[in-house]
Amino acid sequence: MDVLAEALRVSGARGALGVVLKAGGTWGLSLDARPRAALHVVSRGTMWLHVPGEKPLEVRAGDAVLLAPGTAHGIAGASRTTLGPCDRKATVQALTDGSALHLGSAPAQTEVLVLRYEQDPEVSTPVLTSLVRPMHVTSRENAQLRKTVELLTAELAQPQIGTTAAVNSIIDLLLVQFVRVWLTRHPETRSGSWLGAMRDPVVRDALACVHARPEHPWTTASLAAATAVSRTTLSRHFRSALGQTPGAYVTQWRMDLASVRLRDTDEPVESISGAVGYASPHAFSRAFRRARGMPPGAYRSRLRR
């Protein structure tokens, strides 16, 4: 079981191309905090990233920088410049017809691909929100990422049949590659960090068991046996890596799976309850109400109004 792939699938983490920025001369753009992650890929020239409380960061051609959901920031052509508001009318036009968004008065010297990643708001597994600080990856330090950026740039430069599908797939690949870089750069396990838990083999193996068989009646004891450690060791690793008990994670994962199925399918509640490990619909409904604040039927109705 590929734990990361399954978590990305269930969390609904999907990327899309926002706009292509072409800028020249003096330019600066202020971007409000949004409930989605942002990835800026510089395909030509140089861009400076401005994040409150951080030093301006130079991002060169072939580099990319990923920002966690809710990160207000600015991008500009210099380390010291005025950041102006986003021209919403021009942005909407660019999003609608696929044209570039032009900034500055001089001919374009810099080109930036602005990508966005959203996570299903009904899912609580914090994949994207684990990326707390801006992460800058240069073209020199990661050959795989460089090739992916080149592929994305080439696909956008010469659109053809299937370009939309290809671009979306490449954007999703970029997210996986950034997660890999994050795991390499942060070998320590930070409490409460879901991605950090991927560095802990005990927790990672336990998550793989839960993700592969959510219907199994998992307990701390059975998970410990499946990962060949004691219950005390398993609990200690979970608290250190995720800030919660094994049982709490199992329940959270089951509720995420159930939430998606309630919204996206017409499966009976009884069928869903068994699929996520509950012996009876009553037990499932009780657990679901505790987690989501309402019974499964009401939850499904609310999302389908």
Question: Predicted segment positions?
Answer:
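Hydrophobic residues on short alpha-helical segments
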Residues: 39, 153, 207, 256-259
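Glycine- and charge-enriched low-complexity intrinsically disordered segments
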Residues: 100-112
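Basic/polar phosphate-binding segments, predominantly the helix-turn-helix DNA-binding elements
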Residues: 177-183, 205-256, 273-302
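An amphipathic alpha-helical interaction segment
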Residues: 111-125, 129-208
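Generic structural signal for alpha-helix termini and adjacent loop/cap motifs
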Residues: 45, 78, 155-158, 213, ...
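Short helix-to-turn junction characteristic of helix-turn-helix DNA-binding domains
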Residues: 42, 210-213, 261-262
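Generic protein-terminus/edge-of-domain signal
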Residues: 1-64, 71-103
